[in-house]
Amino acid sequence: MKAPTQNDPQTRRPAAFTLETEEAARPSATQKRAPRSFDAEISLTPDEDDPFLAPADIDAAALPVATPKKSRFSFGKLGLGALGVLFSLAFGLWADQLIRNLFSRSDWLGYTATIALIVALFAVLALVGREVFGIMRLNAVQSLKADAETASLDKSPKPARAIVTRLNAVLSHRAETAKGRAALKETENDVIDGPHLIELAERELLVPLDRQARALILNSSKRVSVVTAVSPRAVVDLAYVLFEVTRLVRAMAELYGGRPGTLGMLKLLRDVVAHLAVTGSIAVGDGLAQQVLGHGLASKLSARLGEGVINGLMTARIGIAAMDLCRPLPFRAVKRPGIGDFMSDLTPDLSGGKNGEKA
């Protein structure tokens, strides 16, 4: 028979144990913090000072908008004006002496010269008047844009209504805006904040014109690309680019209601070039060439075709600047077009077709 051990329940000696109560086993309740007030105010960090904001977003928001140069006093203009008066007096004395000599020879010669002088003066006055009205139309568009910027900061609908009325007058000759004008007329009795009303006018009236402006820019860029690729001489490229850019800027101004004359066109071209020079966009140079011709495209493009693509993109950039200047409202409700929007149209897939299929 086996002897009992110490752990055998029949032979274990009695012992004392300490039992914990339920109150001790449960964790003590957390004391609630008494309400307190803080003196420090919440500070908001501006986007330009936020180090965690994407730099691309900051650059896109800070993209400069084309604005016309303000006319300033110039001694050159003063000198040209004085010379113009002097030559006008000289022409008047010459015409008077000529007509007197013709009358001394024969009356019908004198009357013919007088009628010719009157017709010439009338034509010159008509040309001057047309140029003045063209410049006034351009100034009216720029004044409307500046007033729209101010009205967009005011919540009151009254300034915005005045902007919409002026915008309707500027674009009344465009049939594409008829539907938008009717839609805005239906909102005359609605309660709309000033900024929202201006954005609504931009969507209804300017979006159809923006589509046409994009088509104008794209078609001009494609023509410049093709002519540059096939032209035998660089002087032909330069002449055609100047012609195409001038036609594009004029078409852009007429699209948005500017309709400038010759002097107004020269002023508009000067403003476009000044905007490109300020933003640094006129020097597309090596950076844009590497962007377009990189990623294996350089081996597939000839040198002339590459130059055509570069000139086409440069034409598109000039068209975007002209669009900025001629548009009667700033870009708020819709996205401002960029050079990247035309990149895919001017640089198709060279691997064979648009879908990448081998020809």
UniProtKB/Swiss-Prot annotation:
Q: Where is this region: Disordered?
A: 1-39
- Main location per UniProt? membrane
- Domain of life of the source: Bacteria
Q: Which Pfam families match?
A: DUF697
Is Methyltransferase tagged as a keyword? no
State a GO cellular component annotated for this protein. plasma membrane
Q: How does it sit in the membrane?
A: Multi-pass membrane protein
Under the heading InterPro entries, the entry gives:
DUF697 (IPR021147), UPF0283 (IPR006507)
UniProt key word Cell membrane = yes
Give the UniProt subcellular location, in the record's own words: Cell inner membrane
Record's family?
Belongs to the UPF0283 family.
What PANTHER family does the entry give? UPF0283 MEMBRANE PROTEIN YCJF (PTHR39342:SF1)
Q: What is the protein name given in its UniProt record?
A: UPF0283 membrane protein Atu1356
Upper lineage:
Bacteria, Pseudomonadati, Pseudomonadota, Alphaproteobacteria, Hyphomicrobiales
